[in-house]
A protein has these predicted regions:
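Ferredoxin-type iron-sulfur electron-transfer modules and their immediate structural context
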Residues: 1-18, 73-105, 172
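Short helix-coil boundary/hinge micro-motifs
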Residues: 1-15, 19-21, 153-158, 163-170, ...
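A short, structured beta-strand/loop element
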Residues: 9-38, 108, 113, 175-178, ...
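Short, structured motif recognition centered on aromatic/hydrophobic residues
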Residues: 9-11, 46-51, 58-60, 141, ...
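Extended intrinsically disordered, low-complexity coil regions enriched in Ser, Thr, Gly, Ala
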Residues: 21-26, 64-75, 147, 215-225
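Ferredoxin-like iron-sulfur electron-transfer modules
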Residues: 35-50, 82-103, 113-134, 146-152, ...
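Iron-sulfur cluster-binding cysteine motifs and their immediate structural context
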Residues: 57-68, 102-120, 131-148, 207-218
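Short microdomains enriched in Cys/His and/or Lys/Arg
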Residues: 71-90, 123-139, 156-171, 221-237
């Protein structure tokens, strides 16, 4: 993915692109993702709207040239772990870089991911802590096994998601999964990670990354998909 300085994301390599709906549990808390409508990335490159104002989302239609937005890419080049707090628990550690919060709220059920990590000597708390940290789409939270010091990560194929948050009535960022590289038009390559969320509403203060602003402004992309496809995790428990 190339992030143009004043326009769209240019996607190369034809990764699959689909809506990813945040689905709630019985308490209306974020619990799993479910795939929605698929979109083509056959065009090489495929231009994905970054300003939030396109009339043919998720694709760019040139609206960025007249839209009321600040396209500047202000995110620092630091690695995600460089600014992360470490939460120490019984059998787990969890890294937390709050700057990358996208307000997906998978960390809230059953207490919260921080409390569950601290209580991870308990097998059920450990299982839930790993689940909640791993579901964080941006990688803000990551659970680590204290014995091996290896992170818990879903094995994502290179793919893109358009996050849809039906509980709060907003559309989220561009979920970049499976180590797809993202670089500035000028050449700088951002840290390559398994989980990244880039801004689609045009209003993040940490571009190109999403900072959750879409939730406070209730930004909607107007896509007409439904959550009918595969779920993450595959078995919803």
């Amino acid at each position: 993915i190339t992030v143009t300085e004043e326009g769209p994301y240019l996607v190369y390599g034809r990764p699959p692109l689909a809506e990813q709906f945040i689905m709630p549990n019985e308490s209306n808390e974020s619990w799993y993702f479910q795939q929605g409508r698929l979109f083509s990335t056959e065009a090489e490159p495929t231009a994905i709207c970054r300003c939030g104002a396109s009339h043919r989302k998720p694709y760019c239609d040139g609206s960025h040239e007249k839209a009321d937005w600040d396209p500047r890419l202000t995110a620092r080049p630091d690695a995600l772990l460089d600014g992360a707090e470490v939460i120490d628990g019984g059998t787990l550690q969890m890294t937390d870089n709050e700057k990358y919060c996208v307000f997906a709220r998978f960390c809230h059920p059953h207490g919260d991911a921080w409390t569950l990590t601290e209580a991870s000597d308990d097998p059920e708390a450990r299982k839930l802590a790993i689940r909640e940290a791993s579901m964080c789409p941006s990688g803000r939270l990551t659970a680590w096994d204290k014995e091996t010091m290896k992170p818990f990560e879903f094995r994502f194929e290179p793919s893109l998601g358009l996050i849809e948050d039906i509980t709060i009535g907003a559309s989220g960022g561009l979920w970049i999964r499976g180590g797809i590289p993202m670089r500035r038009e000028g050449g700088h390559t951002y840290e390559i990670r398994n989980r990244v969320v880039a801004c689609r509403c045009g209003q993040s203060a940490n571009k190109p990354y999403c900072d959750g602003t879409h939730a406070s402004i209730k930004w909607k992309d107007g896509l007409a998909g439904e959550p009918v496809g595969e779920t993450l995790p595959e078995e919803v428990y």
